[in-house]
């Protein structure tokens, strides 16, 4: 299984290593450290913002990454604090609405390639700190990435309003009081900022995640996001904590 997963791994080991570091080395203590900018940097790594919002050879968060989907090719946006090409003119309320509801400052809908259905779980504090980080610590990039141009009728962004009615989740994460604080922290990260299900859950014909097959593995164009459920045969149920840590850092386990 490890070899199969390794053979289909995209060339983003460095990003996965940073992600692993954020979860296993920084941990909850770092997430609760003082300073919105430091916490925002932690949330940005946990949310893997740079992976989609940075094109190969491009500047961090400047957008332009081409994402091929069954609906057409989408390009990620510039999310640096540029007031002309990025999100520099976004208020915190504008930012929160884009991140958690998929609605831009101008009122137009984002496509669910942006995982706002997962980010809706994020706490107000995490969104606040993420906003502070982008506005104060990210370098502004004064350039516009390629624009997404999808065929009719998906080029009508207003159609996303109906999709959102059916599939958008507007609830923040609710801890399970019967579980440990460690379990709840892991559930929050997996379901919210880390948005594991965005890649590892198969999608229906309307491109919605199939909740009945949550984290069961999904095809993503030229590569495959494997089953990461607790199933001991097809999933990672037999993996130890160290196995998971090693895989996230290196892309394989022995």
Positions of the model-derived regions?
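N-terminal secretory signal peptides that target proteins for export/translocation
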Residues: 1-11
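Detector for the c-type heme attachment site
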Residues: 52-58, 100-101, 135-136, 199-205, ...
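Electron-transfer interface patches adjacent to heme c in soluble/periplasmic c-type cytochromes
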Residues: 68-97, 117-127, 207, 213-247
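Hydrophobic or amphipathic alpha-helical targeting/insertion segments
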Residues: 127-134
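Extended, well-folded interaction surfaces typified by the phenylalanyl-tRNA synthetase beta subunit core
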Residues: 142-158
């Amino acid at each position: 299984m490890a070899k199969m997963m390794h053979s289909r791994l995209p060339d983003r080991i460095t990003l996965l290593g940073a992600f692993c570091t954020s979860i296993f080395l920084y941990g909850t203590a770092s997430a609760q450290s003082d300073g919105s900018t430091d916490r925002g940097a932690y949330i940005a790594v946990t949310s893997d913002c740079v992976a989609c919002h940075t094109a190969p050879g491009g500047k961090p968060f400047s957008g332009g990454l081409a994402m091929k989907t069954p609906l057409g090719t989408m390009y990620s946006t510039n999310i640096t604090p540029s007031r002309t090409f990025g999100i520099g003119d976004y208020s915190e309320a504008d930012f929160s609405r884009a991140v958690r509801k998929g609605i831009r400052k101008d009122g137009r809908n984002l496509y669910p390639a942006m995982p706002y259905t997962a980010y809706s779980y994020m706490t107000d504090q995490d969104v606040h700190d993420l906003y502070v980080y982008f506005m104060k610590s990210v370098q502004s990039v004064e350039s516009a990435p390629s624009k997404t141009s999808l065929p009719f009728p998906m080029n009508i962004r207003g159609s996303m309003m109906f999709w959102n009615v059916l599939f958008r989740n507007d609830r923040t994460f609710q801890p399970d009081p019967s579980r440990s604080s460690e379990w709840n922290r892991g559930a929050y990260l997996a379901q919210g900022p880390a948005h594991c299900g965005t890649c590892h859950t198969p999608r229906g014909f309307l491109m919605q995640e199939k909740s009945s097959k949550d984290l069961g593995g999904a095809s993503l164009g030229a590569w495959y996001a494997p089953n990461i459920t607790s199933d001991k045969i097809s999933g990672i149920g037999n993996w130890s904590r160290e196995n998971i840590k090693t895989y996230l850092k290196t892309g394989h386990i022995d």
